[in-house]
């Protein structure tokens, strides 16, 4: 479909800027002057909230389609697919912030696993130029069925590699003309290594994701926006900033301590980093004469909390591990506790279904529970501040046993249960969080929300998290 020149001239452009994991109270004149200016001079929605579970891919699917998770099926960052995903090493619990994995899941579920049109797909059908730039995973979600690189420009962590979406010849030529590489930098390329998450003995990164995000901002400002102006058509550009999320996850300011948590200098630097990227885009619009015809929408996908690994009731926390401080919850504690409550074996879906022995935990926190890992009675998809539990055969008795075990744990805050399985005391239905829909992917039987509590810090949120990250680092969910 072609838009008439007069319509094209009057049509506004759109930039959706997503500062991943930005907390509203973090937007201050010191840390984020560009965001403050947009908030104070534009329209400010002062009471926003994320889709729950509050994970990147879940909220990306909502932003991209306008549908709730019950329809999109992107229930979290890690989901149960009920089939071995080849590009995830044969795991049935893939982490879906990954271009090849998204392609595999799309192919398995009739070519479009979310079963909805995305905004970039709809925009380009109406004659708009379209681009998605930024963090691996959510960036592709905005036009995930377009994998040629010809119809929508897609630039993320994998750009220039075999795993990435190809660059069109037009984009290759434009990048070269701007003096920009055809291969995206990695998080390791920032001196100090932003990808360093540390471990229980060593703290994580002390630097923001500057180099990689500067590349993304330069691609948008110096290549994509000028290209779109030359086309003389309206455009939609999605810019998904990994910071502050990536840095708040990995920061080493608060190793094993909940204070200052994610309120330290490295987290503040990550907020400034995202703000700098937005400033680059605004300057480019000014220079290109596009400011008056371009609307900028800023929307974080979720907030953030400081990780707590404390529990006085968890059997998993009472065991000893070689890589976990004594008395703290290990990664995969939920799967360990459920397997113990059901007196069933636990297997690791991300390590060729190997049995998880006493004093060990699964490699990524996920778990297959039952006598046969190929036909699990229960599946746990570990995500962080909340987890997904699947009961593939929807057995109400087994579900009730799991619920009883969870309600006895001090780390549980809320339980949401599939209404098709039944109604259980002390729980809420999945429909109350819009997770009961027509999703193509398997629907969780239970969503477990972990305990959160106040600390003495300026932004006093700490949350129990099922993650390989350490107490004092950052999480959401």
Segments predicted by a language model, with ranges:
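Acidic, His- and aromatic-enriched active-site or binding-groove loops in soluble protein domains
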Residues: 69-72, 147-189, 258-276, 316-358
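C-terminal segment of classical bacterial N-terminal signal peptides
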Residues: 1-5
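His/Asp/Glu-rich, glycine-adjacent segments
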Residues: 67-68, 74-254, 380-381, 385-391, ...
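Secreted, luminal/periplasmic, and some membrane-associated catalytic domains
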Residues: 53-55, 77-88, 93-106, 146, ...
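Beta-strand elements within well-structured catalytic alpha/beta cores of enzymes
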Residues: 11-24, 37-39, 63, 123, ...
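Short, structured active-site-proximal loop/turn typified by the sulfatase FGly-forming signature C/S-X-P-X-R
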Residues: 25-74, 78, 129-133
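A long, amphipathic alpha-helix that forms part
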Residues: 206-232, 237, 244-294, 321, ...
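Loop/turn elements at helix/coil->beta-strand transitions in domains of secreted/extracellular proteins
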Residues: 10-15, 41-45, 71, 125-131, ...
